[in-house]
Design a protein with these regions (language model features):
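Bacterial N-terminal signal peptides that target proteins for export
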Residues: 2-13
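Bacterial N-terminal signal peptides
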Residues: 13-23
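Sec/Tat signal peptide C-region and signal peptidase I cleavage site
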Residues: 24-28
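Proline-anchored loop/turn motifs at beta-strand termini and strand-loop-strand connectors
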Residues: 37-59
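Surface-exposed amphipathic alpha-helical segments
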Residues: 49, 175-208
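A short, structured loop/turn motif at beta-sheet edges
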Residues: 139-147, 170-173, 207-208
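A short, solvent-exposed beta-edge/loop patch
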Residues: 163-177
């Protein structure tokens, strides 16, 4: 079973970090509820977040502000199963939402399995990924009744070490990865872990 996770271009990651440092305002919605095109998911993110989805127009001014090729970024999102890329200014975190499909022989009864079984299943996924180290796997149940496996992730993106906290859940044959990434490559601090949990806790499914 080979699971492909989203990869970013170095240019986009650098541009997003620059936006935080420069306090670029505004390409986010006024409402803090974000409907993610292409997947039946809504998230609550702070107003003022910078948000990219697959439906961001290729000629949107956001790409000019970031000084990146909008067509290339959107192609990258589609190629790598990435449905949302959002940057928060306070705290300085990047959030991504990825959905991939599991092979039919790798399905698990997510709702009825024991916590240890869920962690073991997710750890088996991580073992097959390159440049990824996961630890501190645990199960988190949100107020929405969604069960997640939560893990701390040490990875590499274009030769740069990244630290993140990832929440994984499965619905049917679909795996959803919600990842909160330290924007500057530093280890997440306690308040940032709490914030990632808050965002995961606000995730809602609006359909099957």
């Amino acid at each position: 079973m080979k699971i492909r996770l989203a990869k970013h271009t170095r240019a986009l990651a650098a541009a997003l970090a620059f936006c935080v440092l420069s306090a670029v305002p505004a390409y986010a919605q006024e409402d803090d509820t974000v409907e993610v095109p292409g997947v039946p998911v809504t998230l609550s993110l702070p107003a003022g977040s910078l948000i990219l989805t697959r439906e961001t127009p290729v000629d949107d001014a956001i790409f000019e502000t970031l000084n990146v090729d909008g067509a290339a970024i959107l192609e990258n999102m589609n190629k790598n199963d990435l449905y949302l890329d959002a940057v928060l200014f306070k705290p300085p975190l990047e959030f991504t939402l990825v959905r991939v499909q599991l092979p039919s022989n790798s399905l698990i009864d997510w709702e009825n399995s024991e916590d240890a079984q869920l962690c073991a299943f997710v750890e088996s996924i991580y073992e097959q990924l390159d440049n990824i180290t996961a630890d501190d796997c645990s199960v988190y149940s949100s107020e929405q009744g969604i069960r997640f496996v939560r893990a701390n992730i040490l990875g590499s993106r274009d030769g740069i070490t990244t630290h993140s906290c990832q929440y994984i859940t499965i619905r049917g044959a679909d795996v959803y990865y919600l990842t909160g990434i330290a924007l500057y490559g530093d280890t997440l601090i306690s308040s940032e872990y709490d914030f990632v949990e808050k965002v995961a806790g606000g995730l809602r499914f609006t359909g099957p």
